[in-house]
Design a protein with these regions (language model features):
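Phosphate-group recognition and catalysis centered on beta-loop-alpha active-site segments
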Residues: 1-283
Length: 283
């Protein structure tokens, strides 16, 4: 019985070590608390203006919202703002963003409009000129096959360009490796772990074990995130534990059909899409 108790205790301690968040850093999180942040900029279901376009970011800043956006590399290592791994949903082209160079990528029209995918630097400049106090949540996109060296270069480029932005910003990723790299390269930047429900990971084809690990934040030991960005699904025990331990809770993505008042009450910041909430719901 004593041996069994010791085994259980060790397992519990290992799990706690795996999922534990960073200590609270209230000064860094203050600009985000109570803020509604426009998912990929402020755009409508008709993609007018298109998501992750300069007009969508300018509209969000003009309306006083925070902004969530996505960054990744082109094949020639230009840092661009684009959500999907592939081009076919938002442009006439096909293939992966990381396999196309900037010249070809920048020529692609977004959602049949006259807008084109922007460089991250141009996005930052546009927002700074519109409202320099706009809080930014920057998601660094990743794929399982990306090497440590590639991710380090991607994070380094993102951090370097953010230094020119005058307003508050933080970095998040679904990939715990990215959060860990940000922790090492720029420990003073607020960092967050994105996570989805176990059911969503399984639906997307993720095997059961990694789906459980990702949804239950077992990668937190790499990045010790300041915040958890969680989906509308019910919080599992690991997410609840992080909230109890003081991690800032960010909700993605609130839609018009959700109980948005409830989501605002339960979260420190909300990433929204396709409706017009108040700029801030909590002071």
């Amino acid at each position: 019985m004593k041996i069994l108790f010791c085994i259980v205790l060790i397992l519990v301690l290992l799990v706690l070590f795996a999922v534990w968040p960073n200590k609270r850093r209230d000064a860094l999180r203050a600009p985000f608390v109570g803020h509604n942040c426009a998912h990929r900029g402020y755009f409508g279901k008709d993609q007018r203006p298109p998501e992750n376009s300069l007009p969508a970011f300018a509209a969000a800043a003009q309306n006083g919202y925070g902004i969530e956006l996505d960054v990744q590399f082109t094949s020639d290592r230009r840092l661009v703002v684009f959500h999907d791994d592939t081009l076919d949903r938002m442009t006439p082209a096909k293939g992966f963003v990381h396999n196309m160079d900037w010249a070809d990528f920048s020529a692609q029209p977004l959602a049949g409009s006259n807008e084109h995918p922007p460089l991250f630097a141009d996005m930052l400049r546009t927002v700074a000129e519109t409202n320099p106090d706009t809080p930014l949540i920057v998601e660094i996109k990743s794929r399982a096959e990306y090497s440590k060296t590639y991710l380090e270069e991607l994070c380094r480029a993102t951090i370097a360009e953010l230094k020119a932005y005058p307003g508050p910003y933080c970095i998040e990723s679904f990939d715990p490796r990215v959060v860990g790299i940000v922790r090492r390269q720029a420990p003073d930047i607020l960092r967050g772990q994105l996570a989805d429900s176990y059911q969503s990971y399984r639906k997307d084809g993720t095997h059961a074990v990694p789906a459980f690990a990702f949804s239950h934040l077992f990668g937190n030991f790499l990045g010790r995130p300041d915040f958890i960005a969680w989906c509308p699904a019910k919080r599992n025990w690991a997410v609840k534990l992080n909230a109890a331990l003081g991690a800032m809770m960010v909700m993605w993505t609130a839609l018009p059909e959700h109980d948005t008042a409830k989501l605002e009450a339960e979260n420190d910041a909300v990433i929204f899409q396709w409706y017009a909430p108040k700029q801030k719901y909590r002071e």
